[in-house]
Amino acid sequence: VYPIEALAPVDDSAHPGLWFKSYARQQALRRRQTAEIYPEFGPHLNGGFLSHVAGKVFIRTRIPKVNFRIHNGFVQGEQLSAETSLAETKLCHLHARDFDHFLQAYRYRLARGSYRADLKPAPTPDGAGLNLNALFSLLETEGGEAALRRFYAEVCEASPALRARLADHDHLHRIDLDLAAKRARFFPQTASTVAK
């Protein structure tokens, strides 16, 4: 199941639900579209995402000697190769719901999380490129928090301009998660005590 990543609301007049972005599965098309959608930072991004694009796997647990990893599974030490893509299923990833949330998680992600130095950069034809750790470190060194905010505004905020560019490439999704209703349905005894 491949992810879609939530965009941060830019005003309080939003309809129910959140805007999400997706990306092209084919690598060359993804590179081209990402550069078009995110004009300043696209060349350094994998599909415009701050997190993974690998998706998640669902594996039958009764398979003998199965081992799970975050983005794949192994049976008897061999990575699973047979897969069925659930194209109609959307894995909604809420990576950075607003700039303050982005900053709160930033240092941890830079050191030990999804922006750490040992992760590969977005694939490019020449193999050169900055990974998110190098990009964020460069931005922060040259422009401080204002540069990080500029990045966040282009890549993460559901501005009308970004939504239009995503829609032009069929990568804009509107989803009403309605988490309060889901909690009430599946956990009626605790739904009213959970912070909304």
What are these model-derived regions, one by one?
Residues 1-196:
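Catalytic-site signature of metal-activated, phosphate-bearing donor transferases
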